[in-house]
Amino acid sequence: MIAYKFLRPDGSSVFASFRWPLPEAEPGDWVEAPVEPCRSGIHACRASHLPHWAGRALYETELGGRIVEDAGKVIAERARLARRVRAWDEQRDAYTRMCADRAHELVRGAPPELAHWDSVVEPSIPEGPALLGFVAARIAEEIEGRADAYHAERARQARWLVERLGLPAM
């Protein structure tokens, strides 16, 4: 199964700080761990969940062995980094800006009591794509008053990423 994983620029994972064997001309070495969601196993995501995990460096990841689907992620017994998605390096700032612009757009159409969200957007840009995607989705949820608006905004963001990064359709 092909999935995706965001890592720090040095190849270490954000939550566990595990340093991955990086791919060069060939995929990196296999890594193994028992599967236990949020505790152990190789955590990755499908393209539809990229906005939830946006980070500095994106890798296409080959999963193997036992694979468990969980909310917003997949957990595998084995994985290796197949390749770095270089298009993310080129599109990360554009994605952040798109999310900021979308947040502004949503606030412009929102009831006056949600106007305070607009002041959050620009100061959040240096924090990067994960925060801006979340802010836009939260504004959508506040406007509609229901969680499916949040998920619809996240799905819109995922479609943008799939298209711009040249990933297989979801």
Predicted segments, located by residue:
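Short, glycine-biased loop/turn motifs at secondary-structure junctions and
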Residues: 1-170
